[in-house]
């Protein structure tokens, strides 16, 4: 992981009162799994890879549908989501 990381609890349970998710990018890895990279207002808009709720391990999704659903329902994000599929991998 080249990007800084952020624990999921930092923008769900412990999100600052005026904190906002500024952008969402979803990347596909070589193994076909998907992960999130979010930019949040309280970290100066720096894009961070999302880790598990309480562990610094990358949170992975088996399908793009589950990743998008999680962003929209759990994080209450209603903006643009940019997808970065891995060339040569099927999108599922």
Residue ranges and their predicted role:
Residues 27-56, 77:
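Short aromatic-glycine-(Arg/Gly/Cys) micro-motifs in beta-strand/loop hairpins
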Residues 1-19:
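Negatively charged, low-complexity tracts enriched in Asp/Glu with abundant Ser/Thr
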Residues 11-14, 27, 35, 84:
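Phenylalanine-focused residue identity feature
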Residues 22-25:
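A short linear hydrophobic-aromatic micro-motif
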Residues 8-10, 45, 51, 67:
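Generic preference for well-ordered secondary structure
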Residues 60-92:
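Short, compact, well-ordered microdomains
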Residues 16-18, 28-30, 73-75:
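A generic structural signal for short, solvent-exposed coil/turn residues
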Residues 2, 57-58:
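Short N-terminal micro-motifs specific to bacterial/archaeal maturation
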């Amino acid at each position: 992981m080249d990007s800084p990381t952020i624990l999921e609890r930092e923008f769900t349970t412990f999100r600052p009162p005026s904190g906002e998710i500024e952008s969402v990018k979803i990347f596909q890895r070589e193994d076909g799994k998907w992960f999130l990279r979010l930019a949040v207002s309280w970290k100066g808009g720096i894009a961070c890879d999302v880790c598990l709720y309480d562990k610094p391990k990358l949170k992975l999704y088996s399908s793009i549908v589950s990743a998008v659903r999680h962003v929209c329902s759990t994080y209450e994000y209603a903006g643009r989501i940019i997808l970065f599929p891995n060339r040569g991998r099927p999108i599922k």
